[in-house]
């Protein structure tokens, strides 16, 4: 089942986010949609994933270690919500 995810990292800037992204090797398995942007005192990452298992495997095994290697903190917020709908919006 698809899931909607939110990660919020305190004190992360656009520059740090881009450094972490540059250290990764392409899109992770299982991601369907990604969006991110600044929030007060940090950075928010939203995603839609094929499953919570895919999200957890990437986040815990790849992304958080990469963030910490660049001097970033652990996420202050980590939410996973089952998606009722995950797909394009049809305009009609």
Model-derived features with residue positions:
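Short S/T/G/P-rich N-terminal loop/turn motif that feeds into the first structured element of a domain
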Residues: 1-46, 50-65, 72-92
């Amino acid at each position: 089942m698809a899931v909607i995810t939110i990660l919020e990292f305190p004190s992360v800037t656009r520059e740090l986010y881009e450094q972490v992204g540059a250290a990764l090797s392409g899109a992770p398995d299982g991601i369907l949609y990604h969006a991110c942007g600044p929030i007060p005192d940090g950075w928010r990452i939203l995603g839609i994933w094929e499953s919570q298992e895919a999200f957890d495997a990437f986040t815990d095994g790849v992304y958080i270690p990469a963030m910490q290697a660049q001097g970033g903190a652990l996420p202050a917020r980590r939410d996973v919500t089952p998606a009722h709908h995950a797909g394009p919006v049809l305009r009609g």
